[in-house]
């Protein structure tokens, strides 16, 4: 049977594609005159998957996710999953100054009040999923990224912008059967730090730089400039989440041959779809 999907306001850009694979539950979502959210589920069922990304406006989309969970429970749904393509507050995963919250922990606990299972895409720190009281899984779209770039890279290589992102580069490289490595920072003077790729020769090769989030794009631009100096042929940049600061798309695009992100957040360079991963969750029903 087809799974029942609920599309939140933060995932409207995925609605058309998802509707081809599953039944959409009819819900009414609007605002009261004072700005508060109104949610009403217009159908009945037993199990449902809510899809709600929590990019800007983050707080509004998070509240809506909670209201959808409560409304579905009131409507008689007994098992609820939520897919959050981009989870807000996920980078606030530790206390850096006394008196701060662990914001992502608070979000996880609230979601756990209504949802049995939580699925996120390429969360900043996968260990934070331990705060969710039910089943929680991190999905990394390595296959989708690899399939998009396979005909562009040839016998190229995959690079992570730092060691922390190496696992992402590894997973894409393994799908493509290509070499992978990462950049490291080398201090060349008391005031200057230089990035360099570790143990790989990029001269004459196409290179794909892989990361989880692009915001300002400064790291990617710096990495691309270094690769140019080292003789790289074509340079591609990809991230799961395009959290672009103003002007970032233009700046990064000028520095590389192509910039692409997935559609966890809708942007003008969201060229890689995550919908197949979401649909597979429904097929397990």
Swiss-Prot record:
Keyword Nucleotide-binding attached: yes
Cofactor note: Binds 2 Mg(2+) ions per subunit.
SMART domains: Pribosyltran_N
Gene of this entry: prs
Name by which UniProt lists this protein: Ribose-phosphate pyrophosphokinase
Keyword annotations from UniProtKB, A to Z: ATP-binding, Cytoplasm, Kinase, Magnesium, Metal-binding, Nucleotide biosynthesis, Nucleotide-binding, Transferase
Chain sites annotated for binding ATP: 34-36, 91-92
Pathway entry: Metabolic intermediate biosynthesis; 5-phospho-alpha-D-ribose 1-diphosphate biosynthesis; 5-phospho-alpha-D-ribose 1-diphosphate from D-ribose 5-phosphate (route I): step 1/1
Family listed: Belongs to the ribose-phosphate pyrophosphokinase family. Class III (archaeal) subfamily.
């Amino acid at each position: 049977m087809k799974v029942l999907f609920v599309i939140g306001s933060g995932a409207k850009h995925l609605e058309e594609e998802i509707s081809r694979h599953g039944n959409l539950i009819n819900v009414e979502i609007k605002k009261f005159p004072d700005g508060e959210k109104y949610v009403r589920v217009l159908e009945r069922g037993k199990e449902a998957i809510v899809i709600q990304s929590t990019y800007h406006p983050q707080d509004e989309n998070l509240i809506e996710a909670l209201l959808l969970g409560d409304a579905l429970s009131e409507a008689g749904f007994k098992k609820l999953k939520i897919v959050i393509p981009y989870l807000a507050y996920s980078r606030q995963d530790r206390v850096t100054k006394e008196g701060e919250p662990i914001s992502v922990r608070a979000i996880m606990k609230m979601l756990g009040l209504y949802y049995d299972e939580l699925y996120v895409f390429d969360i900043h720190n996968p260990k934070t999923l331990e705060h969710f009281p039910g089943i929680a899984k991190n999905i990394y779209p390595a296959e989708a990224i690899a399939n998009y770039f396979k005909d562009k890279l040839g016998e190229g290589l995959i690079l992570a912008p730092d060691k922390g992102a190496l696992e992402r580069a590894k997973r894409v490289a393994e799908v493509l059967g290509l070499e992978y490595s990462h950049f490291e920072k080398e201090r060349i003077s008391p005031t200057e730090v230089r990035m360099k790729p570790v143990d790989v020769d990029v001269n004459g090769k196409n290179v794909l730089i892989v990361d989880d989030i692009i915001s300002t794009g400064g790291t990617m631009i710096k990495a691309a400039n270094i690769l140019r100096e080292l003789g790289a042929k074509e340079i591609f940049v990809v991230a799961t989440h395009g959290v672009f600061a103003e002007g970032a798309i233009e700046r990064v695009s000028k520095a590389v041959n192509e910039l692409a992100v997935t559609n966890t957040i809708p942007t003008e360079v969201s060229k890689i779809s995550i919908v197949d991963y979401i649909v597979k969750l429904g097929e397990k029903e």
